[in-house]
Amino acid sequence: MLCVLCECRKAMLKRPKTLQPICKPCFYNVFETEIHNTIVESNLFFPGERVAIGASGGKDSTVLAHVMKTLNERYNYGVDFVLLSIDEGIHGYRDDSLETVKRNKVQYDMDLEVVSYSELYGWSMDQIVAQIGNKNNCTYCGVFRRQALDRGSAKLGIAHIVTGHNADDMAETVLMNLLRGDTARLDRCTELVTGSDDSPVKRSKPLKYAYEKEIVLYAHYKKLDYFSTECTYSPEAFRGTARTLIKNLEAIRPSTIIDIIHSGEAFVLKKKKEKKGKGSVVVKAKVEEKPVPSGGCSVPLAFDSSLGLSNRCTKCGYLSHNAVCKACVLLEGLNAGRAKMQIEGDSADGAAKNIKTLEKLALSI
């Protein structure tokens, strides 16, 4: 059977997204072109921007790094990409995957920065799970990871991170929020670019519309070097329930993944229109043009350094709406469980060393 796109080469695979029989060169082309179109249509980058790639060593981040390097050279984005990895401290998983990232650093000729939970917080994920058990450990990891990425970006002087979240991840998040009745989060979870007042860093997802199966095929046919083991603690996550449901639906209807994403986007748009009110006129505020700082998705950062310390955590100096940021709140709970452990001579309490470490790394905004 011939490829339906070029009609000259033998079809080597059936594309998961469309079920079209295509050859490998055409598959590479459509896969990369769709990602390029996502980047261009959303104005994700600007020439001279320095952008961090969230690198875990897994298939998604490895394909992301490979494609970003390829497209950057092909279309002359003029972007300086660097790799940023987080070491959560999960033995047998993260230590091995970081070795893959180190090889990717050489393969793609990119700088690499690794930020460790143990250095930032005084806790590894293995220690956290040993303390709290298997439930809710993803909550701790999510909060700590987000702040670790911000601090790593600040160290690199970067305000824009691209992550390997794919279409399957997006659909799972939409479904999770619906199953939990958390429709308020649909707005954020369907956006290609996200940011918040609690973070100085913009995050974008160039692989938003790329199917996981196609990412795996791309990595396989391109013979990319990636780590394929799943996180030790992820089977306990609620996301697994949504993933199983979506995989079952996808087997019947391949377009299910994109359909769910578009449904989430449409739901958000409808909510926004209803909030505006019938007959109301929405006037966009005029934004004063200023030089865009390093990184930022071509959009000035949403925070203002003139806000001062009132918007910073009183313990570690991290941006926060509350007096104490989420990471420090979680750390206080963890350190309370260490009451019977020997207190280090130079620390007033079990949390002091961790807080001092975070204070030294307070973001300069």
UniProtKB/Swiss-Prot annotation:
It is found in: Cytoplasm. One of its GO terms (molecular function) is tRNA binding. The keyword NADP does not apply. Pathway: tRNA modification; 5-methoxycarbonylmethyl-2-thiouridine-tRNA biosynthesis. Keywords: Cytoplasm, RNA-binding, Transferase, tRNA processing, tRNA-binding. Its EC number is 2.7.7.-. PROSITE patterns: UPF0021. It comes from the Eukaryota. InterPro entries: CTU1-like_ATP-bd, CTU1_C, Ncs6/Tuc1/Ctu1, Rossmann-like_a/b/a_fold, TilS/TtcA_N, tRNA_thiolation_TtcA_Ctu1, UPF0021_CS. CDD domains: CTU1-like (cd01713). GO terms for biological process: protein urmylation; tRNA thio-modification; tRNA wobble position uridine thiolation; tRNA wobble uridine modification. It holds the Pfam family ATP_bind_3. GO terms for cellular component: cytosol; cytosolic tRNA wobble base thiouridylase complex. Its main location: cytoplasm. SUPFAM superfamilies: Adenine nucleotide alpha hydrolases-like. Plays a central role in 2-thiolation of mcm(5)S(2)U at tRNA wobble positions of tRNA(Lys), tRNA(Glu) and tRNA(Gln). Directly binds tRNAs and probably acts by catalyzing adenylation of tRNAs, an intermediate required for 2-thiolation. It is unclear whether it acts as a sulfurtransferase that transfers sulfur from thiocarboxylated URM1 onto the uridine of tRNAs at wobble position. Prior mcm(5) tRNA modification by the elongator complex is required for 2-thiolation. May also be involved in protein urmylation. Belongs to the TtcA family. CTU1/NCS6/ATPBD3 subfamily. HAMAP family: CTU1. This is Cytoplasmic tRNA 2-thiolation protein 1. It comes from Yarrowia lipolytica (strain CLIB 122 / E 150). The lineage of its organism: Eukaryota, Fungi, Dikarya, Ascomycota, Saccharomycotina.
